[in-house]
């Protein structure tokens, strides 16, 4: 009887388990259907019931996927704390049950929530952990998990402005033929955003439309909202078709509201408001933008908050509410700065401001119209909008410098000339130790053309350059006060002005180089760096120079797209330089010009470092800009000193680094940062100043100019004054080398106004030694005589 009863109980239990399993399966199906339809609250309810059923059955891996569905639904509803809680609980279950597949998915989803909240460092950390874990997943799922993670990384880098890194990931994903429709659609959307930013809106629109069709046929409501929004963005911001843009945003808004997708609703309102603003419908635009701001604040969407505030500011400015516009712009910048401060690595910050510089520009241009102009505030804003990542490397714990702090560092003979450029207009600030002035002008096509023509002319030997230099000088130097006691210019360029050799501009019938020493700065923040004053003299046995020249060639250079000619004058250049400096020299030529010798610490404690080698400025990936050195250990493979490695050098005691190579001042221009080139890396590594080149110059005149430069340095001139003297020697030579092509491309970045230690000549040392020896001998003789005078004399007894 007992056995029969036990059997009955087992059968009943099995039947109950089967019923519970069937119920859980049905709930999972209902959850998936509700998610696809955008019925997120229903999806959460079904997933919670499925989770309870799976927990009763002891199926923790399945329960983790129920929690994942709860997290996804809450993400669409912009309930980010609830989403994070669900994903974290799911991750705990995954790790308990040993589900690598589930854990990697959860890490990606936690990263996605952090991405939506604008917490990009945290998002990157989650994605990278997921990427590292993929090899622990079953072989059958690795490809899918890698696609998911790579797609998220691409979207993150795209958001941060690192378009080239994003394109690398998208290129990798595009070759995958196993994508599901929703995955393919998401890739199309992301690639479309990149093409739009790279200036190809037609291709972007085609990609968005293809994505919208894929999302629609696969029933992916959130993806379809994204596709319609991006279609509207192209019509509004690129093509200028406001009617089609508004139609697309209306569709996105209707779909978002039908599924309670609050993030989608905020974004549709935001971009519809921008479309309306662009066609002058200020009242309607203001309402949409305020509604977008309210929705973004309510859901914690920081990216949408600053964009809405920026749009509100532009609406207010258009309706003459200048105070309201200023308040909105300042609030938008506050949001941007809060996100930037959360980016914990330099790599993430590098291009973060690229698509946000417009907000700073709007506030600068608005405030520049005030009378009197608030110069101190404008200076702070301009510095805040430029070279921020470089400033972080220079002073990790400091804000952008104040006008007063910079003025306190300026000598009486120096002007700081700081430029700011935008689509609306340009500004020039000239600042001395006791004065500051500003001049503004609307953007003018004639001035921009004159500057472009000048840069083109001076970079071509034999061209007639004076007229172009006059026109560009009027565009860039108009209004510069006449002060005969000022002999040194510190220039902080902006944007493409970074490629203008100001010394070759003409003012009052003379070239700038005939009137001023000139140095360039990435930011005025460099002037606030604490540095000890150099000694006036140094001993001749102390090392003055470490130099690398004419490295032994490698068998092939796979990174280079053009042949590298020999440098027959590099050896002569370095030996002549060493002779002009007169102190000790550590010279590495041919096979000895190796990277290992540049990294072993020998650069740390010398005044001068010199490279007479080939160098390449990589405008696609600045960190891969490189100085070519000899193959290591007598091999045949090329060796490079990369830009990213230069940042890590310790050059705090180096007064001057010279890169006597082609185009070492070129580089990628990043909005909000400037030119990512060698000079910035050298200054951030601690060097006081750097000499680099804007274009290719023939080997022989390059060697001669360097000799003239170091001749002046060796006789006590400051780097800025020495470079000016070398350029004037060329300019007044009555030879073909008088053309700016041969001398204007050499630029000094850094302060460069302080004279460097002069070497005490060996003759003086010898004379001093002789004098000291004579003094010693006299002292000895005097001592002997004194001792003799104290001896008792013997007398006859």
Where are these regions (language model features)?
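N-terminal leader/linker segments that initiate helical-solenoid repeat arrays
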Residues: 7-41, 45-48, 52, 56-57, ...
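Conserved alpha-helical positions within TPR/SEL1-like repeat arrays
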Residues: 25-36, 61-76, 101-116, 144-159, ...
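Eukaryotic all-alpha helical interaction scaffolds
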Residues: 34, 51-54, 74, 94, ...
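Short coil/turn connectors between adjacent alpha-helices in alpha-solenoid helical repeat scaffolds
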Residues: 34-42, 74-82, 114-122, 155-165, ...
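Tetratricopeptide repeat
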Residues: 43, 49-50, 83-90, 113, ...
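A generic tandem-repeat structural signature
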Residues: 72-134, 140-148
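Alpha-helical solenoid repeat scaffolds used for protein-protein interaction
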Residues: 176, 180, 202, 213, ...
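Catalytic cores of enzymes
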Residues: 380, 385, 396, 400-797
């Amino acid at each position: 009887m007992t056995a029969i009863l036990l059997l009955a109980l087992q059968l009943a239990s099995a039947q109950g388990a089967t019923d519970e399993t069937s119920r859980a399966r049905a709930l999972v199906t209902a959850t998936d259907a509700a998610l696809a339809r955008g019925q997120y609250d229903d999806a959460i309810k079904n997933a919670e019931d499925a989770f309870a059923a799976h927990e009763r059955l002891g199926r923790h891996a399945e329960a983790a996927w129920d929690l994942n569905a709860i997290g996804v639904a809450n993400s669409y509803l912009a309930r980010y704390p609830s989403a994070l809680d669900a994903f974290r609980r799911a991750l705990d279950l995954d790790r308990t049950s040993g589900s690598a597949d589930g854990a990697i998915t959860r890490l990606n989803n936690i990263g996605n929530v952090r991405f939506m909240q604008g917490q990009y460092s945290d998002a990157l950390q989650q994605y990278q952990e997921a990427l590292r874990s993929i090899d622990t997943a079953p072989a059958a799922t690795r490809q899918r998990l890698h696609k998911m993670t790579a797609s998220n990384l691409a979207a993150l880098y795209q958001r941060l402005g690192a378009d080239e890194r994003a394109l690398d990931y998208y290129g990798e994903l595009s070759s995958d033929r196993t994508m599901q429709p929703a995955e393919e659609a998401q890739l199309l959307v992301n690639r479309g955003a990149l093409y739009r930013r790279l200036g190809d809106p037609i291709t972007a629109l085609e990609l968005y439309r293809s994505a919208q069709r894929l999302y629609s046929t696969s029933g992916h409501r959130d993806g379809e909202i994204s596709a319609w929004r991006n279609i509207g963005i192209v019509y509004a911001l690129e093509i200028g078709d406001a009617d089609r843009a508004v139609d697309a945003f209306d569709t996105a808004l209707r779909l978002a509201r039908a599924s309670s997708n609050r993030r989608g609703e905020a974004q549709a309102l935001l971009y519809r408001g921008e479309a309306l603003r662009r066609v002058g419908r200020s009242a309607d635009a203001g309402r949409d933008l305020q509604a977008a701001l309210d929705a973004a604040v309510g859901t914690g969407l920081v990216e949408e908050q600053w964009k809405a505030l920026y749009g509100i500011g532009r609406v207010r400015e258009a309706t003459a509410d200048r105070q309201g516009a200023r308040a909105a712009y300042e609030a938008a910048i506050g949001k941007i700065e809060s996100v930037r401060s959360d980016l914990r690595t330099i790599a993430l910050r590098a291009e973060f401001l690229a698509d946000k510089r417009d907000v700073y520009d709007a506030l600068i241009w608005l405030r520049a119209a005030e009378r009197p102009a608030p110069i101190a505030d404008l200076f702070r804003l301009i510095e805040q909008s430029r070279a921020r990542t470089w400033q972080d490397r220079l002073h990790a714990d400091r804000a952008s410098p104040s006008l007063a702090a910079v003025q306190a560092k300026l000598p009486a003979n120096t002007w700081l000339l700081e430029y700011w450029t935008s689509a609306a207009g340009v500004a020039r600030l000239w600042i001395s130790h006791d004065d500051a002035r500003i001049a503004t002008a609307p953007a003018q096509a004639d001035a921009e053309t004159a500057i472009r023509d000048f840069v083109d002319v001076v970079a071509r030997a034999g061209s007639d350059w004076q007229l172009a230099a006059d026109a560009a000088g009027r565009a860039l130097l108009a209004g510069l006060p006449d002060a005969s006691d000022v002999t040194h210019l510190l220039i902080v360029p902006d944007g493409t002005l970074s490629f203008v050799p100001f010394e070759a501009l003409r003012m009052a019938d003379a070239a700038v180089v005939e009137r001023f020493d000139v140095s360039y700065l990435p930011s005025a923040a460099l002037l606030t760096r604490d540095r000890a004053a150099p000694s006036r003299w140094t001993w001749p046995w102390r090392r003055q120079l470490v130099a690398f020249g004419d490295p032994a060639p490698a068998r092939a250079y796979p990174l280079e797209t053009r042949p590298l000619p020999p440098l027959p004058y590099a050896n002569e250049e370095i030996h002549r330089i060493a002779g002009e400096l007169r102190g000790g020299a550590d010279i590495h030529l041919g096979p000895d010009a190796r990277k290992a010798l540049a990294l072993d610490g020998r650069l740390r404690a010398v005044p001068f470092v010199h490279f007479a080698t080939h160098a390449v400025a990589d405008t696609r990936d600045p960190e891969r800009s490189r100085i070519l050195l000899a193959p290591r250990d007598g091999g045949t493979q090329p060796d490079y000193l990369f830009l990213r490695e230069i940042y890590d050098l310790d050059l705090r005691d180096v007064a001057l680094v010279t890169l006597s190579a082609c185009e070492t001042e070129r580089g990628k221009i990043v909005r909000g940062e400037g030119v990512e080139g060698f000079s910035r890396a050298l200054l951030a590594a601690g060097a006081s100043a750097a000499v680099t080149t804007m274009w290719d110059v023939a080997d022989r005149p390059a060697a001669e100019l360097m000799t003239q430069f170091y001749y002046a340095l060796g006789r006590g001139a400051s780097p800025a004054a020495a470079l000016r003297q070398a350029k004037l020697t060329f300019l007044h030579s009555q030879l073909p080398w008088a053309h700016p092509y041969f001398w204007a491309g050499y630029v000094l970045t850094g302060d460069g106004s302080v004279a460097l230690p002069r070497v005490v000549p060996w003759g003086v040392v010898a004379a001093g030694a002789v004098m000291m020896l004579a003094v010693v001998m006299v002292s000895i003789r005097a001592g002997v005589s004194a001792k003799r005078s104290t001896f008792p004399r013997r007398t006859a007894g």
